[in-house]
Amino acid sequence: MKCNNLLYGVELPMCLQSSMGMVVVTGLAIVYLVIYILIYSFTHGPRLSRRLASYVVIGPYEAIAKSRPAMALQRAMVDLTRRDVRTDWYPLNNLLMNKPHRLSENGHKTSGAVRDAARNLITSAITSLGMDKYEISPGGHTVDEQLASHRHYAVNDLHRASADDAVKENAVIVAIDTDYYLRDPSIYFSNNNPFILHTFQPITVAGKDGDVRFTISDNQVDYRVDGGGRWQHKVWNWCDYGEFLYLKNILGILSINWWLSFFGIRKVIYQKIQHARPWVDCPNRALVWGLPQFTRYMITWLPIEMNARELSRVNYQCASRPGWNCLVDHTSTKLVASIGREGNDCHVELAKEDLDVVLGLSTMQSVTSRLLQMGYKQPQTLATVCQFYNSAAYDILSCSIVARPSQPPVHWPLASEIDQPTTSFRNYSNNIVTCGNLCPQLKRWEVLSNSLEHRVTMVANNKVPTPRIARFAEEYVRLVVPEANVGVPYSLEDARKELDKPTQVNAVNQIWETVDMEVRRLIEAFVKNEPTNKSGRIISSFADSRFLLKFSTYTLAFRDEVLHAEHNRHWFCPGLTPNEIADKVCDYVRGVATPAEGDFSNFDGRVSAWCQENVMNAVYHRWFNRKFSKELQKYTSMLVSCPARAKRFGFQYEPGVGVKSGSPTTCDLNSVLNNFTQYAAVRLTKPDLSPQEAFEQTGLSFGDDSLFDKQYQLRWNYVVEQLGMELKVEPFDPSNGVTFLARVFPDPYSTNTSFQDPLRTWRKLNMTSRTCVPVESAALDRVSGYLVTDKYSPVTSEYCHMIERCYMNTAESVTRRRQRKDCDREKPYWLVSGGAWPQREGDYELMMRVTAARTGFEESKLINLISQFQSVHDPWDIKPLDYQEPSPYKDTLDIDGQPVDAVDERQYQNERNTVNLRAGAAISQMPVPSVPGGEDCNRQSADMPGPKSSEGSEQLQGLPEQDGSNRLQCHRQPTFKAKGGSNTKGRSRKSRNGGRSISSKTANPTTHEVGGGNGKTRVTIAKRSGPKRPHNVVSNAWETLNDNR
């Protein structure tokens, strides 16, 4: 007889493994037991005889031990050493949601969300129990101060120091996706502590765990994570039949249990195992928790009568059919068998009773016929079951698998009904930094509504400055335009030649034959399709291209004759080439003591009507001849006040008095207002200077970008505040260089070299919005522009070379890519509109130092990242830099669905009410201001909630209120009252569309009054008869018109 006890993997001495040795060990054990019984008998009296009898008498059940002394000895050992350690705990009381979700798409957002939810559930359950958490190989989201057993096996384990803390009495042992790798779970789970696991317990032999594929071969799970790693491991049978597990206590060196183990006596703990599968999207995931019940000692070389199971690995292989896996699942109301070949993705599930029936048939034809009769009609099921019946085990297809890429994160408005992210962007590599930009969801009306609230409504500015600043405005207008009433606009033909961009040419061609018609007063807004960290920027495009063409005859002439004149050359930068701007920046920085960078917050939205009329538009009216005043006044007034609606969704809104980004004046007049704030600051700081001398002291202006002298900072902030705007002046730091137009000049005192702002570039460099183009071609087109403008920029240039190397062999040819009209759409603006910025190869080290200083990453980390770019062969293998600064995101939700910053409940409710109101308003057809003979402006709403209908806006239904008036209910939207409904009840209203009247006597009998986005009452037709009118849509891609020349 050989003793199979092990002590740390070493067998007992040979002298004790012989027959004589076993006799000695048994004799010593009996002596020990007799001594214990004698002592016990003196203390417990008459009960001892009955207790001793229970050890010896076999009892009503069949005996396991063949020897009565051996049975008595084992029974006595168990009875005399048992100890009650029962605990009670139900962690599912802390379950918050059974279908968690992440907002960002990283390739495994579903399974990742479930793991996050499991971690939160476990943490909150332990906290509510009043106990401490002891985690095995904790992940990066675990607080470092928590107790843990931590080793460095995976790269992510390096987030904290190695540790092997002692398990305290008040601790719950936790393992999240790590129990598979334990060689012996008894090391942790044989203490008197409860434990809880988030583990993988598949119910099929292959398939998907949320959004992650897995197969099983040789009883090892092959778990392939898109956007993550590939893991292979066996699975412990936590969810097998058997309520109680027995685990042998781990021996401490020189402890009592250690000495007892020499005699084959071991301490055992019984854990009560419970499990649940609470997550709908990941049924293969289980939450397993163990509750300690009892402990006792046992003699390992004697039979044991206790009924409990021992933990083991799951065996998925089918013993009777080599090469096949078979698993029976009882999580539903009936047994379901899952079969599939080892390592293959193909698997089928069918009722276990049905599989038992078909396996007993004599021919394969009978198998197929019986399966069809049972209702299994899928060809995959029939073929696989027949192969299983025939015991056909074929070679596993060995091939490389391309992981599904992660998707760009999106901006989620707080007040929205969005379920799934919809964006037109794609990633073509992993992020360079962890805090990538967010992408707008252009197809959602809530996104536009959110941008309107945060960029128009909430920043509306009606402030009027002091009389002193008003006098400075009069001086400034005269300085910019020394000669009054001498200007003549360009002809329409000349303006048409100047508007030479493809979108501009197309728009002008569509209205050229009707250019003599009156201009329609209408703004159509949409969210700009660009990555951002907050609410997306709004493009307020003027719907009528006649306005843009006719107004451009004035703006182009004014820029050429006035703004580019010699007296304005020192401050006005639009229209210059990158080389000219770089030289201008260096000359200005060298000419002042300390430069200062001006950073306006929401410049367009915060411009007041006073600024528009007394500074921006005033320079036009002063220069042009009086005979053009009436026409010019008509155009400039539209910049301040004009009806507006959502271009895609149709709802009306109040555009405010701020700058309209689609106007041809945007860049020029923003520069004028920007420079005026500098002029007023100089006048206040140095009142002894003449107006002309103060004007010459102003810095550089390009739209809302500015570079100024630091000595005027205090008064500059004061002037901007008086105008109702916000300005942040960045202090000059030589280690960070100087920034102008998002270009960093590392040392403008010695070189005009510049490079793109690193973090601003890296956050969006791996994205493309050209969804209809193969991703390889879109990536190459995008990075080719950066390799011209930033040929020597650290990290940026190496990343672009890496993308070229990885995609060059699989992308289309350069000729094919250049044939697309949008091939230059994502290239840097300056490459298309002026050429490359100057960069010297010898300044690389200088740019590296400044890049490290601006981003906060050490140079060594950047060099390691560059080395990674140069060595990888797959752009998805790069590891992003971990950006530790506070989150740059605003007005959105994080990946857990929580707001990233504090939320005002009233503001949130107002935004939600506005979103619901605009949703209802957008469903109906909108009467839009126009002139007789103009185009019909009615546009059908797009991507709105509710089913599409050929009956127009029939889903907008009127519901009676108690007072007899109507309220409106929009499909899938909360009920809301129409604004102003009671004021127009019973009256017809004149439509502004051609002067036609809409009344109850028209052919459209049902009308409802709806409050538009601007709060005005309007009439919507609930049902129309007759054919629909065609939509005359004019292409309006004029948002870059202000960057002409």
UniProtKB/Swiss-Prot annotation:
Compositional bias (Polar residues): 1033-1045
Catalytic activity from the UniProt record: RNA(n) + a ribonucleoside 5'-triphosphate = RNA(n+1) + diphosphate
Entry superkingdom: Viruses
Coiled coil: none
Keyword Transferase listed: yes
A Gene Ontology BP annotation from the UniProt entry: DNA-templated transcription
One MF term in the entry's GO annotations: RNA binding
Keywords on record: Nucleotidyltransferase, RNA-directed RNA polymerase, Transferase, Viral RNA replication
Keyword Lipid metabolism: no
EC number(s) reported in the record: 2.7.7.48
Region described as Disordered: spans on this chain: 916-1045
Pfam families linked: Noda_Vmethyltr (PF19222), RdRP_1 (PF00680)
Domain RdRp catalytic: start-end pairs: 593-718
Function field: RNA-dependent RNA polymerase which replicates the viral genome composed of 2 RNA segments, RNA1 and RNA2.
UniProt record similarity statement: Belongs to the nodaviridae RNA polymerase family.
Listed name of the protein: RNA-directed RNA polymerase
Organism: Macrobrachium rosenbergii nodavirus (MrNV)
Phylogenetic placement of the source organism: Viruses, Riboviria, Orthornavirae, Kitrinoviricota, Magsaviricetes
